[in-house]
Every structure is written in C-alpha cells, then in structure tokens.
C-alpha cells in the first residue's frame, strides 16, 4: 500500500488554511503532523480521509492490485476528535456495529471484540454502556475500533487525547505493531507519540502571500 498526496491546498470557509502540501508514505511508514492549533493539521487529515474536498491537489491510495487508486473509505480508518460511539449501546454493541459496517480490507486478520478490548487494556468491560466509561476509557475503546476491522492506513487526529502516560505507551506499541505489519499511519498530535521511526511534517498554516493569493 502507498499513500501519495500532491500539492494539496484547503480552505475553511473563505480562509485558505494551507497550500502546496505533498508527501508519500509506503507500507510500514508513519508521518506525524505537528504545529499550533489552527495550523491545518485536522483539516489535512480530513482531506486525506476523503471527508473534505481539497481546494487543489490529489490524494491517492494505491497498491499492486489497484495501481489506479482506491477510495479512502476502502483502505483507511479515520479516528477524529469524536469517538463515534453511541453512549446508550454497550462497548460490545458499538464495536460489533463497526466490525460489521466496515468489514475487512486486506489479508491481515481483524481482532475479535474481546481481543480488541484486551489489546487496549480494557478486557472484561464489553457489557458496559459506552456512556458509563471515563473519557480515557472511551478513547481506548474508540481506538479498539481500528482493530476489529482491518484497514492498512490509519489516519489519527490526537489519538492519545485524554490518556495517561501508561496508555500513551500502549497506543504507541499498537501503532508500531500496525507499521511492522506493513500498515501506514498519518497522525496529528500536540504530544510526542513515542514512535521509533516516523517522519514529521510541521504545519505552519498559511501566512503571507503566495502567487498573489492572500491567506
């Protein structure tokens, strides 16, 4: 799997957020977006995930089977600021829904609901309503969604928000394991993720004049 972004630009309303962003990630590679609030990190992730149309530029997910490209929804998980879980449903019901809805992409096997919750350090709570969990526990379960339906590309927006130091390390290990299996990770964060080998793209937002366009 390869992820290629070429000369991306994006707007929020009338404001130009960033211009000329390009990068390429191959299997086993990670890119971490850093920068101040408002610099465009979340916007770039949403563009790559296919949730926001770019002002210009292209995003291509391609592999040997589909050299012409595949849709972001087929090959990527997007974990945003919101956990995308129903408070009134149990942990198991939420994860079962996502497992059935997303299906499985690629040759790697997805985890069962019980194994996924165990992987994020929360075994034995699948019977509890999601709304009963603490903010940190809810974030862990949201991350477990990535494990119950395989996608080669993980797009993560502040994945360790609301987590303590021990959970940070656990998540870093899960991300490393995904990379070792040939996965790709694109993440935005204010805190170091603790990945051993990752590239960094510092987002500065759009300031000044470029080719006559005022940001």
From Swiss-Prot:
<feature type="binding site">
    <location>
        <begin position="35"/>
        <end position="42"/>
    </location>
    <ligand>
        <name>ATP</name>
    </ligand>
</feature>
<dbReference type="GO" id="GO:0005886">
    <property type="term" value="C:plasma membrane"/>
</dbReference>
<protein>
    <recommendedName>
        <fullName>Cytochrome c biogenesis ATP-binding export protein CcmA</fullName>
        <ecNumber>7.6.2.5</ecNumber>
    </recommendedName>
</protein>
<dbReference type="GO" id="GO:0016887">
    <property type="term" value="F:ATP hydrolysis activity"/>
</dbReference>
<keyword id="KW-0813">Transport</keyword>
<keyword id="KW-1278">Translocase</keyword>
<comment type="function">
    <text>Part of the ABC transporter complex CcmAB involved in the biogenesis of c-type cytochromes; once thought to export heme, this seems not to be the case, but its exact role is uncertain. Responsible for energy coupling to the transport system.</text>
</comment>
<dbReference type="InterPro" id="IPR003593">
    <property type="entry name" value="AAA+_ATPase"/>
</dbReference>
<keyword id="KW-0472">Membrane</keyword>
<dbReference type="GO" id="GO:0015439">
    <property type="term" value="F:ABC-type heme transporter activity"/>
</dbReference>
<dbReference type="InterPro" id="IPR003439">
    <property type="entry name" value="ABC_transporter-like_ATP-bd"/>
</dbReference>
<dbReference type="GO" id="GO:0017004">
    <property type="term" value="P:cytochrome complex assembly"/>
</dbReference>
<keyword id="KW-0201">Cytochrome c-type biogenesis</keyword>
<dbReference type="InterPro" id="IPR005895">
    <property type="entry name" value="ABC_transptr_haem_export_CcmA"/>
</dbReference>
<comment type="similarity">
    <text>Belongs to the ABC transporter superfamily. CcmA exporter (TC 3.A.1.107) family.</text>
</comment>
<keyword id="KW-0547">Nucleotide-binding</keyword>
<dbReference type="InterPro" id="IPR027417">
    <property type="entry name" value="P-loop_NTPase"/>
</dbReference>
<dbReference type="InterPro" id="IPR017871">
    <property type="entry name" value="ABC_transporter-like_CS"/>
</dbReference>
<keyword id="KW-0997">Cell inner membrane</keyword>
<dbReference type="Pfam" id="PF00005">
    <property type="entry name" value="ABC_tran"/>
</dbReference>
<keyword id="KW-1003">Cell membrane</keyword>
<dbReference type="GO" id="GO:0005524">
    <property type="term" value="F:ATP binding"/>
</dbReference>
<feature type="domain" description="ABC transporter">
    <location>
        <begin position="3"/>
        <end position="211"/>
    </location>
</feature>
<comment type="subunit">
    <text>The complex is composed of two ATP-binding proteins (CcmA) and two transmembrane proteins (CcmB).</text>
</comment>
<keyword id="KW-0067">ATP-binding</keyword>
